[in-house]
Amino acid sequence: DIGTGSGILAIAALKLGAEVAEGVDIDPMCVRTAGENAQRNGVADKFTVLVGDLSDQASGEYNIITANIVAAAILSLAPHVPVLMAPGARFIASGIIDERRDEVLTGLKAAGLTPIEVKEKRGWVCIICKKSDEKEA
């Protein structure tokens, strides 16, 4: 969970059956809050929260990568996402205002991601992507 903030996306994933989750945020206060929220929700043993940004904290491969942050941050981190995606993984970007939809879609494509679904509701956009080089099943 990039820009984990309160940790809500990672905590929800764990509550819905994910085995483990990692969150990263540049704000140490958010990292502390996410850890406290994980403790309150009984998932602290499965949730690792790190201070920093995606490029210096995330490593390995992930099945799902989430980012519920502003468009500018999504565009900035997008080039780092494909290398972190396991085969068949999905990147879910949300927190995008509808005025920035096309700009974010263009940026995700330029970063090596292929949008496979775009959802819009009440002025907000969520974009689900796969890696551009992912083979069709």
Spans of features found by a protein language model:
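Conserved short alpha-helix immediately C-terminal to the canonical SAM/SAH-binding motif I
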Residues: 29-33, 73, 100
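Short strand-turn motif at the edge of the Rossmann-like AdoMet-binding core
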Residues: 93-98
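Core SAM-dependent methyltransferase catalytic element
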Residues: 114-137
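A short glycine-rich, Lys/Arg-flanked "PGG" loop and its adjoining helix->strand segment in the class I
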Residues: 75-90
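Short helix-capping segments at alpha-helix termini
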Residues: 17, 39-44, 83, 87, ...
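Hydrophobic beta-strand segment of the Class I
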Residues: 64-66
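Conserved SAM/SAH cofactor-binding pocket of Class I
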Residues: 1-54, 58-61
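Residue-level signal for inorganic ion chemistry
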Residues: 34, 70, 108
